Amino acid sequence: MERAPPDGLMNASGALAGEAAAAGGARGFSAAWTAVLAALMALLIVATVLGNALVMLAFVADSSLRTQNNFFLLNLAISDFLVGAFCIPLYVPYVLTGRWTFGRGLCKLWLVVDYLLCASSVFNIVLISYDRFLSVTRAVSYRAQQGDTRRAVRKMALVWVLAFLLYGPAILSWEYLSGGSSIPEGHCYAEFFYNWYFLITASTLEFFTPFLSVTFFNLSIYLNIQRRTRLRLDGGREAGPEPPPDAQPSPPPAPPSCWGCWPKGHGEAMPLHRYGVGEAGPGVETGEAGLGGGSGGGAAASPTSSSGSSSRGTERPRSLKRGSKPSASSASLEKRMKMVSQSITQRFRLSRDKKVAKSLAIIVSIFGLCWAPYTLLMIIRAACHGHCVPDYWYETSFWLLWANSAVNPVLYPLCHYSFRRAFTKLLCPQKLKVQPHGSLEQCWK
């Protein structure tokens, strides 16, 4: 991300314009404000480092997570972890004192790494959305490629290469191409900070294009899910009318109040969305808000994915012997039970699809919320050379951008059942051994 002079004290020519900076470069924060800001920054660092470290440790502890789509989540966690472990800590004393004290060499390294990590984080989000898009719209070919780990590694490497090429060469060579550096002593920001043409080009590649791509992929997933839902509903209606009342047997016993659930103990019920009726494909896990790639194959549930799980509802009555013809009453009972089972599955999947749609909307909204203010203010600030955007708005915008690295572990892995189980294995191993299913909720509570 573009680093501003901490107080916005640079005019168009790059000369110092404030008496405070000339006197010592201090920001002018009171002791109380300095303590509050330092505490908030430390909290952001801890949240970013721990959240993403937990994702990386999960890959070490649970080999079942090492699938192609989850590798992309690992790539995202690595970039976000380094943001919290390297980029933010070096910037904290700079923003609190208004002066860079680590030297010009470390300044260059910090800028290259910061720009690289932020861009790679964005590109990884695009890659995750694209992978989910393929898992839903091209499920057959996608499943066939799940064993090709080299393909995933190539995509991950491409993300880092593109992220470096976006800003790295410009940061390293700008002062040599322009005939000298315009950055005063005690400051650290990119030479192209006020070059509007470069920034609009870079912003298009770093934010506008990725944002539109993520929106397109997730909207396509939503429309695909809605289309398949309508097809299932239409197929259920075309199955034929119910038999007349006089041909119908007495209704089966009333099912439990929670469709698709079974007792879990202590008066609770466990949803069967991972085990029974309406089981979703790994790419969009049922009940997990559809976040992140699954640990299995990444394909969304097909219209026939629950044929095996719903077979209990379509078993023939025991009175039917092998080779005997079913009576009209038995046939109507079987047909009715099948229709009830299909109706349950359709309602369950419709509820799941709504959750998936909401989760996809959250992903796009959070990404846009964290990146749009910074990108727009950066372009406006460059156009007017820093005179039309208050400094506190600009600094708030890129702290919001950094906060995206702390939010990503929540949006993607932590909302995924297989990752939560791996985290429970790390944090609450004893509870997982005693209560392998119920311990998940208890541990996270």
Curated annotation (Swiss-Prot):
Residues bearing the modification Phosphoserine: S439
InterPro entries given in the database record: 7tmA_HRH3, GPCR_Rhodpsn, GPCR_Rhodpsn_7TM, Histamine_H3_rcpt
Extracellular side stretches: 1-39, 92-108, 178-196, 381-396
Keyword field: Cell membrane, Disulfide bond, G-protein coupled receptor, Glycoprotein, Membrane, Phosphoprotein, Receptor, Transducer, Transmembrane, Transmembrane helix
Compositionally biased intervals (Gly residues): 289-299
Membrane topology: Multi-pass membrane protein
Subcellular location per the Swiss-Prot or TrEMBL entry: Cell membrane
Biased composition (Pro residues): 241-256
PROSITE patterns: G_PROTEIN_RECEP_F1_1, G_PROTEIN_RECEP_F1_2
Biased composition (Low complexity): 300-312
Disulfide bridge map: C107-C188
Entry's transmembrane regions: 40-60, 71-91, 109-129, 157-177, 197-217, 360-380, 397-417
One Pfam entry name: 7tm_1
Glycosylation sites: N11
GO CC annotations on file: plasma membrane
A GO molecular-function descriptor: histamine receptor activity
Domain of life according to the entry: Eukaryota
Cytoplasmic side: 61-70, 130-156, 218-359, 418-445
Region Disordered, annotated ranges: 234-259, 273-336
CDD domains: 7tmA_Histamine_H3R (cd15296)
Assigned protein family: Belongs to the G-protein coupled receptor 1 family.
Purpose: The H3 subclass of histamine receptors could mediate the histamine signals in CNS and peripheral nervous system. Signals through the inhibition of adenylate cyclase and displays high constitutive activity (spontaneous activity in the absence of agonist).
Protein name: Histamine H3 receptor
Species assigned in the record: Mus musculus
